[in-house]
UniProtKB/Swiss-Prot annotation:
This protein's record includes keyword tRNA processing: yes
Chain sites annotated for binding S-adenosyl-L-methionine: E43, E68, N95, D117
Single GO MF descriptor: tRNA (guanine(46)-N7)-methyltransferase activity
Free-text function comment from the UniProt entry: Catalyzes the formation of N(7)-methylguanine at position 46 (m7G46) in tRNA.
Protein name: tRNA (guanine-N(7)-)-methyltransferase
Length: 211
């Protein structure tokens, strides 16, 4: 994804109440931030944020956290959130490798991983967001019976992820190898997803649950 550089993006972000500049201050306290006890779902690598904004509007009784390491993408999304007046979402400019610095054990009910970088070279497998190193972190952060929802256009990443989930004793609740070819029940789609659908590319999806 090509992103136009905005030199003062970090300063501009601070103007928006939906942006959390110091998320580590809310570790184990996110219900205090949202001022309610609603479930918390997080999307890791939200890109421009279309997917998580759609979910937030559809599910006002769920709190959403959008995490993205590229400042310019966070800025684009937070502007849309303000324009659409969405109240149950916060955005973080953060790297997934530091998740445990901002989230407490059992604080999250669902994690979304949408079209994450597949890191195709074998020597980079530890960077994949479904590598067992990341799964160890997710298992700490998720509540009992918490879920990971994965969507990808990469068959290799999908197969790798299924293997990793199985090795870490997740239950595979749903495994679909052509999501939009079999059914188009997915209401919330990412920008990438819409592009791939238009090109006729299959989308792979799975839901993995902690039992």
């Amino acid at each position: 994804m090509r992103v136009r550089n905005i030199s003062n993006a970090k300063e501009l972000l601070k103007e928006y109440k939906e942006y959390v500049a110091a998320p580590q201050l809310f570790k184990e306290q996110w219900h205090t931030y949202f001022e309610n006890q609603n479930p918390i779902h997080i999307e890791i690598g939200m890109g421009k944020g279309q997917f998580i904004r759609t979910l937030a509007k559809l599910n006002p009784n769920i709190n959403y956290i959008g995490l993205e390491k590229v400042e310019e993408l966070v800025l684009k999304s937070v502007r849309s959130i303000e324009a659409e007046e969405i109240c149950n979402i916060s955005l973080i400019n953060w790297n997934a490798v530091k998740l445990e610095e901002i989230l407490g054990e059992g604080e999250i009910e669902r994690i979304y991983l949408n079209f994450s970088d597949p890191w195709p070279k074998a020597r980079h497998d530890k960077r994949r967001l479904t590598h067992h190193g990341f799964l160890d972190i997710y298992q700490k952060l998720l509540k009992d019976h918490g879920e990971i929802h994965l969507k990808t256009d990469s068959k290799a990443l999908f197969e790798f992820s299924l293997e990793q989930f199985t090795q870490k004793n997740f239950t595979l609740v749903e495994v679909i190898e052509d999501l939009h070819g079999s059914t188009d029940k997915e209401i919330a789609k990412t920008e990438y997803e819409e592009k791939f659908i238009a090109e006729g590319k299959p989308i792979y999806k799975c839901i993995a649950r902690i039992e």
